[in-house]
Design a protein with these regions (language model features):
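Carboxylate-rich, polar loop motifs that coordinate divalent cations or form catalytic acidic clusters
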Residues: 1-203
């Protein structure tokens, strides 16, 4: 399970329901859950069997999604406002259109032990964290991706992110480095060193 706490206010429709009301509707052993995410006003859970659950905290409605092509445990998941679900498993990364029930395998794989957070920016571009080693940028419209690898001495760890729109994406690493991502050039630069990452990578 993620090392995070998701605290959601219970809706008025659940006011008189027992504390285990939602758990019983999910009908799954909590020990099987592998990840959690709160997106599009729903709590999303992934489990070891490749199943995904959406829970409405306002009324307790639970939906279960079984995607036939996904058999592995869900490592991470993200759901966008447009109804696209992004999933990582040990077999790869996927985009799932909930409305059309259409699954697309993305052109990269992240090992389960390195699968970090998934998030999207102001321009609906998707970002995948690959452990402390890299960030993968994915453009859903153009179906393109780019991997930004970090030198070993400058791992990203639990970074902080600020989306500045046209100015770019700013990342602050635990080591105090400020990184700027240029969406037009698909380049990332260290602000406090003013040189691209490729200068530090081994030949």
């Amino acid at each position: 399970m993620d090392y995070q706490i998701l605290s959601l206010r219970k809706g008025s429709a659940l006011k008189d329901k027992p504390s285990d009301f939602i758990q019983k509707k999910v009908s799954a052993d909590p020990k099987l859950f592998t990840c959690a995410s709160y997106n599009s006003k729903f709590l999303w859970l992934g489990d070891q069997n490749g199943h995904i659950y959406s829970i409405d905290p306002q009324n307790g409605v639970v939906n279960r999604y079984e995607i036939p092509e996904i058999k592995q445990a869900i490592s991470r998941l993200l759901v966008t406002e447009s109804g696209l679900m992004y999933i990582t498993t040990n077999d790869g990364a996927y985009e799932y259109n909930i409305g059309y029930k259409q699954l697309t395998k993305l052109p990269f794989t992240i090992p389960q032990e390195d699968s970090g957070i998934i998030f999207y920016d102001k321009y609906d571009k998707i970002w995948f964290q690959e452990g402390n080693h890299a960030l993968i940028y994915y453009d859903p419209l153009n179906k393109s991706s780019h991997r930004f690898t970090f030198p070993n001495q400058n791992t990203i760890g639990n970074f902080e992110m600020q989306d500045a729109g046209e100015q770019g994406m700013f990342f602050l690493t635990p080591g105090g480095e400020i990184l700027l991502f240029d969406r037009d050039k698909l380049e990332m630069t260290r602000i406090n060193q003013l040189k691209p990452f490729s200068d530090d990578l081994p030949d």
